[in-house]
């Protein structure tokens, strides 16, 4: 295939910022990418009680998908695409952006389920940081389709040298 398209995730929280780290939608697209095929994780931001703007999706994705397929010239690319929940006349265009970030999540909470068991729920996600202007959070909220090329390498290169230095004695002592 020329392209793997991972499910259209439709919900009030899309795959932006840190969400890509634990998203099943992005995980599915990553599998295609690891098989050597350009892949896209699609998400549509929905507002509770509103119908999905499928005309907007059709308009936004028509040219975008064709261009994404053409970009797989040298090597595959892993894409994250978030569509805003706006009517076609309010769609502002497409922007290639970096991932934004959120403030800390709210604290987990405890409840008792219908079977009398104690369950622990993660608290709601934190709000996007206001300082993130040209990111997926900001521009998607303004009515843009946001497109982010992703990588599977989650190595923190800024801390790699410090970690090697701090753990050098352990590395030297370790016998394999």
What are these regions (language model features)?
Residues 14-23:
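Glycine/threonine-rich flexible loop motifs
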Residues 40-42, 79-81, 145:
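Hydrophobic/aromatic beta-strand patches that form the interior of the parallel beta-sheet core
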Residues 40-67:
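Short, glycine-/small-residue-rich phosphate/pyrophosphate-handling segment
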Residues 63-66, 70-74, 78:
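A glycine-rich helix N-cap at a beta->alpha junction
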Residues 1-5, 10:
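Single conserved hydrophobic/aromatic residue that forms the stacking wall/gate
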């Amino acid at each position: 295939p020329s392209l793997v398209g991972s499910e259209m995730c439709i919900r009030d929280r899309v795959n932006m910022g840190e969400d890509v780290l634990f998203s099943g939608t992005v995980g599915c697209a990553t599998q295609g990418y690891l098989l050597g095929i350009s892949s896209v994780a699609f998400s549509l931001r929905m507002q509770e009680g509103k119908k999905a703007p499928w005309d907007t999706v059709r308009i936004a994705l028509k040219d975008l998908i064709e261009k994404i397929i053409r970009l797989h010239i040298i090597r595959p690319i892993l894409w994250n695409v978030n569509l805003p929940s706006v009517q076609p006349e309010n769609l502002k265009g497409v922007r290639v952006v970096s991932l934004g970030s959120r403030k800390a999540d709210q604290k987990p909470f405890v409840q008792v389920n219908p079977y009398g068991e104690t369950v622990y729920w993660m608290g709601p996600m934190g709000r996007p940081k206001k300082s993130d202007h040209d990111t997926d959070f900001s521009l998607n909220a303004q009515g843009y389709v946001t497109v982010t090329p992703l990588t599977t390498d989650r190595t923190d290169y800024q801390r790699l040298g410090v970690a090697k230095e701090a753990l050098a004695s352990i590395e030297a002592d370790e016998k394999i």
